[in-house]
Regions:
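Extracytoplasmic/lumenal acceptor-recognition loop(s) of multi-pass membrane glycoenzymes
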Residues: 117-118
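Conserved thiamine diphosphate
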Residues: 109-113, 165-166
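Long, low-complexity segments enriched in small/aliphatic residues
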Residues: 100-109, 126
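Cofactor-pocket helix-loop regions in the catalytic cores of large enzyme subunits
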Residues: 1-98, 121-247
Length: 247
């Protein structure tokens, strides 16, 4: 471990040390299916390297304990001082195309664009001025919280765009029961997904090659996509549909 980095840049290390005391490489080897010697070798290589970086995907985060998985990787990064220098740090890989761009644009219930917190009065005032309308100071609900609110009767209608919660929700049965309870469900999609079967209205959207747009990668590169194919049938770009509803 990097004692200097821990002392000057972190808190809670002693508590973490006590918490993991019983999780030796020998104890974890049968759980992980990796020999204890290999675990030790990888740990030493990571800690002693001039620059080590952790990249992880959905295998880490899409679990009931996904947040704790990520916290463990963050703790490993901090205790070894492998952060804040070229070639170090943490790099969570996004699960689908343009998740990064959507997040940057504010499609997260507790953030405005550029990750400005909804609860931040100064940030809210800036966006109220920019958009010319009052904004709710309370953060929205997460996908899981939304399904819970439907079961409680707090949400009676939903507009789902580019999402398939009947399959992707952590508890698909719970999500499907919620979708069936809704008084009105509008789904905007390019495919007839499982969620579409619960919809009262389906709005046909265009796929990637049928519209103009951008995709943002986690390396900060923004790729421009130009329409290459005509949209089939009545399909329209997502933004066009939203604008028509707003009018």
């Amino acid at each position: 471990v990097d004692e200097d980095f821990i002392r000057s840049r972190t808190i809670g290390y002693e508590e973490l040390k006590r918490n993991v005391a019983n999780y030796s490489p020998e104890a974890m080897a049968p759980v992980c299916g990796i020999p204890a010697a290999t675990i030790k070798e990888v740990a030493r290589l990571y800690a002693k390297s001039k620059g080590s970086m952790i990249l992880w995907g959905m295998g880490i985060s899409q679990h009931i304990h996904g947040t704790d998985n990520a916290r463990c990787l963050i703790a490993l990064c901090m205790m070894t001082g492998q952060i804040g220098r070229p070639g170090t740090g943490l790099h969570p890989l996004r699960g689908q195309n343009n998740v990064q761009g959507a997040s940057d644009s504010g499609l997260i219930p507790m953030f405005y664009p550029d990750y400005q917190r909804v609860a931040n009065g100064e940030a809210r005032a800036r966006f109220e001025k920019l958009w010319g309308t009052p904004l709710d100071p309370q953060p929205g609900l997460t996908v899981v919280e939304i399904m819970g609110a439907v079961h409680k009767g707090e949400i009676r209608g939903m507009y789902i765009m580019g999402e398939n919660p009947a399959m992707s929700d952590p508890d698909a049965h719970h999500a499907r029961e919620a979708l069936a309870k809704l008084e009105c469900l509008v789904v905007q999609e390019i495919f007839l997904t499982e969620t579409c079967y619960y919809a009262d209205v389906i709005l046909p959207a265009t796929a990637w090659p049928e519209k103009n747009g951008t995709v943002t990668n986690t390396d900060r590169m923004v790729q421009l996509g130009r329409q290459a194919l005509d949209a089939p049938g009545d399909a329209k770009p997502d933004l066009w549909i939203i604008q028509q509803i707003a009018r």
